[in-house]
Amino acid sequence: MAVSAGTPISLVNAVYGTLVERAALGRKRLGRPLSLTEKILINHLADPANQEMERGRSYADFRPDRVAMQDATAQMALLQFMTAGLPETLVPSTVHCDHLIMAKTGARIDMGVAIDTNKEVYDFLRSVSAKFGIGFWGPGSGIIHQVVLENYAFPGGMMIGTDSHTPNAGGLGMVAIGVGGADAVDVMTGFPFNVRWPKVIGIKLTGSLSGWSSPKDVILEVARVLTVEGGTGAIVEYFGDGADSISATGKATICNMGAEIGATCSVFSYDQHMAKYLQATGRADIAAAADKVASELRPDDGAQYDQLIEIDLNSLKPLINGPHSPDRAHKVGAGVGDAARENSWPLEVSAALIGSCTNSSYEDITRAASVARQAAARGLRAKTELLISPGSEQIRATIERDGLMADLEAIGATVLANACGPCIGQWERHADVTAKPNSIVNSFNRNFPKRNDGSANTLSFVTSPDTVIAIALGGRLDFDPTVDTITAPDGTEVLLSAPVGEVLPANGYDPGVDTFTQPPADGSKITVAVSPTSDRLQLLEPFTAWDGSDYIDLPVLMKAKGKCTTDHISAAGKWLTYRGHLENISGNLFIGAINAFNGATGEGKDITDGGTRLYPEIAKRYSQAGISWCAIGDQNYGEGSSREHAAMEPRFRGGVVIFARSFARIHETNLKKQGLVPLTFSDPATYDLIGEDDRISVMGLPPVPDKPITCRITKADGSTVDFEAKHTFSPEQVEWFKAGSALNIVRQNLAKK
């Protein structure tokens, strides 16, 4: 499979070549107008003539146009792909090195340290990419989603990526879905991508943004309205005159953070902003092709939505969301100030950060730099640590050429590497800062405890780059740039003017250093070596098939209280080192989970001797003793990133069932992919009935689609309580369970060919 540093026009033309006909087929079959979401999905169905298309119920097989993987998740995905026995991927695929670079000093030094520290992993990813026909974007290329937007995304396309913020490509009208590595392996080996047909949430935007309001405030408001669970099982489709007023990169910001409401993905209709962005990034041919089918790259008149929300951009005010949950919204200034005083959050800001895949475009940086120039002209500097992460090498080179980097450095900013950095916990801070409660503001996406720097003392607030730079200058969490002033060195009071940005660089983009490696035409002679003594990479052994028995008297390894995100289940930060080594990464299993029985973090009771140990130690002991176990989650269990390690680790250590009041979509699928059984309490109150010494039995396995499962709690005194649990297994997914994993099914099917 030939893979280059861009999407070939032949692929785009092939997608557009069937779009009109298949959209017409969809209208005929459904008997109504179509949303844009439905048009794209129907055009990518494996069997558009016969596939059931009932929103929220039907499972469907899709043929995505491409796969993208970031370096932290690519390791496990490609270790799985290597076991399939194919000579190359069957769908265009790329690897992007962005997650393993620690932010500490600045771009040049940090990059050098990362290349040295991660040499074994980078060499593995580079060689496995070359062998199997995968495009390789080396360290320094930039954040996967910005690179995809600049080079691969196109209106009406469909892609999957092994990162939860893959929906960023919706800013160019693409259905882009975050998945676990096993889903990526399915597609790379030529099998369809199977997912439940999503509901469609319509968000009508009217008016236009102005002043200090930005695209980030749109998604912060959507998160407030829908909460972190409100988008689960749905694609969010934005439309209206307000949508057409937002730039392509602004649209991408909104789609990107749709992951924080649990949405499958988000998408905007094709418009002239997208066309101009395509032209500016060297893809005028794709814009011209999209223009020819433009009517099918927008929803039909009368398109139906399962839920409709309207937001007036004219009246939208800047927001700041946090701490600990991205839907905890406050108005900038007095709103967050009142909440801070009520909750004893520090008002002094210890750090301000601009970047991440959500907000690191040229437009984002120009708006922040316009505020910085005002400040520098009056002798002002940031009153806190100010860190900037460019989204890509192209962005870095362009903002350096255009003087924007210098504008930011003039007020005290440090420019970090083109990478994720602090957004995913790759940030080495001074211990004296994190030793006490401290507040940080950033333009990132997630603000879970310990997310950015590993410290439970850090309270993280998410907002726009504009507001971040203003708060950095004001020095306080409750600084409101629309009314508050800053005292200049000469004693005068400075009221900052609203930011002004440039959507696209007037002199075009500077591509910077070429960091892409195209795979050779024939990689068959390339050797991919994994040392048996490596502590970072480990070849995988297939999980064992189900033995045909019900699960009886399972001990409860862990019962989580409140949020239990994938960060709680499988922490990032320093643990990113072991993302390619299943045994070593399993040392972080549940270390962030709050024990519902005693409030402790990361530890519980070991049934073998009654002692208290860290969860990963207990899980290892159970595994060595041949004890299968279950875990209990609360609401939206597995919220957050797409990391499949949060499913592979429990499976590796003997976990067989995960119960929860509700699941996040990606994580629920990842659990099924690895042969576990995710079950939702039919009565959420059942969660409260489960005690530390209870044993739980799951009867009537394997799961039967659309039929609940009967379970039993056995108390220490021998008394029992029966309860019902729901599941979402499709017939195909039942086969994953029976085989031991979805990958085992892939191997079996390939062996038959």
For each feature predicted by the language model, list its residue ranges.
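Extended C-terminal subregions enriched in glycine
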Residues: 377-427, 433, 641, 647, ...
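Terminal amphipathic helices with adjacent charged low-complexity linkers/tails
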Residues: 50, 54-63, 77, 97, ...
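Mobile "lid/hinge" segments at catalytic clefts and subdomain interfaces of large enzymes
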Residues: 4-7, 71, 154-286, 380, ...
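Acidic, glycine-rich flexible loop/linker segments
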Residues: 486-503, 667-736, 743-746
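Long, structured ligand/cofactor-binding scaffold of large enzymes
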Residues: 12-14, 19, 23-198, 580-628, ...
